[in-house]
Amino acid sequence: MKKLILTAAARALTAGPASAQTVRLGTEGAYPPYNFINDKGEVDGFERELGDELCKRAGLTCEWVTNEWDSIIPNLTSGNYDAIIAGMSITAERDEVIDFTQDYYPPTASAFVGQKADADITGGTVAAQVSTIQAAHVASTGATLAEYATPDETIAAVRNGEADAVLADRDFLAPIVAESNGELVFVGEPVPLGGGVGMGFRESDKDLKQKFDDGITAMKGDGSLNALLAKWFTESPVAY
């Protein structure tokens, strides 16, 4: 069941005009440090803080909705929530179905991780999360693609030997490698994929998209977006 979580920004705004717009923000809740569920059962992470701040700046009441990754776009277009903020890379294929804001996380490379540095990433089995740009890339390389529903399952597949390596965003993998005590290592060269990470909206919601786009522009301009990036991505820092 999808989980609705009233944000702090929403609570602060409930005393406002009754006409204030309530916006439902859809995320996966399983892709740290972008988004995850904390010990209190609440959405947390970089995108939680970013989304709350964007809602505050736009004067919007916002709720958080968690949704499995492989249906996150269909459930946006069907109206289950109003925006996606879930570590989603901007791609031409996705842009044919939904509209993206500008990126709030700059284009960065994906990476392979395995149990040894010479893991076979061209002829072996490579794990990737289903419906991701990484899965599409693996399918195009000649390696055997093993798709999993969640990011954690892709890591588990490498640890238990089901896959020779995993391909995912480097910033997701970096803390996992650092905390593995040498069990996991980066393999080969980084792989540039996607056009950065942006928020996704229904194509009919152009005015709503613009409110968030304006907020992202303002946060880039005043340095607050860079401050959030520095806070949450300590293993692979990026900035605008």
Residue ranges of each PLM-predicted region?
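Gram-negative bacterial Sec-dependent N-terminal signal peptides
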Residues: 1-20
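Ligand-binding clefts/hinges and TM-proximal coupling segments of bilobed small-molecule sensing domains
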Residues: 61, 137-153, 186, 216-240
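A ligand-binding cleft/hinge motif common to bilobed small-molecule-binding domains
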Residues: 71, 88-97, 164-193
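A conserved helix-loop-strand patch within extracytoplasmic ligand-binding domains
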Residues: 60, 89, 94-96, 100-146
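Extracytoplasmic small-molecule ligand-binding "clamshell" domains
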Residues: 21-87
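Short helix-initiation/N-cap motifs at beta->coil->alpha
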Residues: 48, 64-74, 130-131, 146-160, ...
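Periplasmic-binding protein-like
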Residues: 106-111, 174, 178-217, 235-240
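Extended ligand-binding regions for polar small-molecule ligands
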Residues: 49-57, 116, 124-125, 129-134, ...
